[in-house]
Amino acid sequence: MPELPEVHTIVQDLKQSRLIGKKIISTEIFWPKTLAVPTPEIFCQQVQGQSIQNVDRRGKYIIFQLSNQMFLIVHLRMTGRFQFVTSQTPASPYVRIQFNFENGDQLRFHDTRKFGRWYLVSDVEEIIGHLGPEPLLSSFTFELFEDMMKNRKTLLKSLLLDQSFIVGLGNIYVDEALWEAKLHPLIPANQINLKHLKILYHSIKYVLEKGIQARGTTLGPGRTHYYRLDGSKGEHQTLLNVFRKTGHPCPRCGHLIEKLIVAQRSTHICPICQKK
């Protein structure tokens, strides 16, 4: 699933394309269940003739602001991705929704596994109001993080994956942040001392910023993996220290990386650097 760096990269790609200001002349819906709200009929009516004013991000959600003050909120889930092309570009059978613009450009939403969801609403808080703070904003201070962690008995990895606690972190960047901080994923959050809490705070920011600079993580070939708007790969997969590195030597101590299951997720750790 695309995490904060991947979604950030997609949003930047969309902003830098010719998309902003484009007027939607028609919409084609090939998989109606992609639309969470409203119905396909109402959706097509409400976006018809509207232009895309801005594209932004909140956590793992992409937010398109339309000229009628409506907001299209998209969650990519496992395999959702966008392609901004001309009408002459051959379409794959995995396009679920397509916007057609007045000059022949098209915005296509590909989703192999059909888990992605679109929401068209007038109030973004209806969909994203439950989300926790953004870890890369200046308002996400260590003092705030320390206060958030107090009295939390939840296992560390499970807590960091909780989007109502903090947004944008998923399996990749949690594993990488915990390795950077030398923390075991099964430690209860309230048992981390102040020194290691500060290290974790900076590690979260570091791995996310590194992921953004590398334009995200593409874990393999094929349509089920993350790709940028132009179809190119991210580069962060070449910089991973532990994620999907089972059996490889730890870059820090040389011990072999191990895999365990935490919160029903494959989790990768160095058992020497990250002792429980």
UniProtKB/Swiss-Prot annotation:
Keyword presence, Metal-binding: yes
Known cofactor(s): Zn(2+)
GO biological process: base-excision repair
Reaction equation(s) it catalyzes: Hydrolysis of DNA containing ring-opened 7-methylguanine residues, releasing 2,6-diamino-4-hydroxy-5-(N-methyl)formamidopyrimidine; 2'-deoxyribonucleotide-(2'-deoxyribose 5'-phosphate)-2'-deoxyribonucleotide-DNA = a 3'-end 2'-deoxyribonucleotide-(2,3-dehydro-2,3-deoxyribose 5'-phosphate)-DNA + a 5'-end 5'-phospho-2'-deoxyribonucleoside-DNA + H(+)
Keyword DNA repair (UniProt): yes
InterPro entries documented for this protein: DNA_glyclase/AP_lyase_DNA-bd (IPR015886), DNA_glyclase_Znf_dom_DNA_BS (IPR015887), Formamido-pyr_DNA_Glyclase (IPR020629), FPG_cat (IPR012319), MutM-like_N-ter (IPR035937), Ribosomal_uS13-like_H2TH (IPR010979), Znf_DNA_glyclase/AP_lyase (IPR000214), Znf_FPG/IleRS (IPR010663)
SUPFAM superfamilies per UniProt: Glucocorticoid receptor-like (DNA-binding domain), N-terminal domain of MutM-like DNA repair proteins, S13-like H2TH domain
Cofactor stoichiometry and binding remark: Binds 1 zinc ion per subunit.
Molecular functions per Gene Ontology: 8-oxo-7,8-dihydroguanine DNA N-glycosylase activity; class I DNA-(apurinic or apyrimidinic site) endonuclease activity; damaged DNA binding; zinc ion binding
Domain of life according to the entry: Bacteria
Zinc fingers, FPG-type class: 241-275
Keyword set, alphabetical order: DNA damage, DNA repair, DNA-binding, Glycosidase, Hydrolase, Lyase, Metal-binding, Multifunctional enzyme, Zinc, Zinc-finger
Residues reported to bind DNA: 113, 152
Active site (record annotation): 2 (schiff-base intermediate with dna), 3 (proton donor), 60 (proton donor), 265 (proton donor)
E.C. code: 3.2.2.23, 4.2.99.18
Record note on quaternary structure: Monomer.
Function per UniProt: Involved in base excision repair of DNA damaged by oxidation or by mutagenic agents. Acts as a DNA glycosylase that recognizes and removes damaged bases. Has a preference for oxidized purines, such as 7,8-dihydro-8-oxoguanine (8-oxoG). Has AP (apurinic/apyrimidinic) lyase activity and introduces nicks in the DNA strand. Cleaves the DNA backbone by beta-delta elimination to generate a single-strand break at the site of the removed base with both 3'- and 5'-phosphates.
Family indicated by similarity: Belongs to the FPG family.
Protein name (database record): Formamidopyrimidine-DNA glycosylase
Originating organism: Protochlamydia amoebophila (strain UWE25)
Organismal lineage: Bacteria, Pseudomonadati, Chlamydiota, Chlamydiia, Parachlamydiales
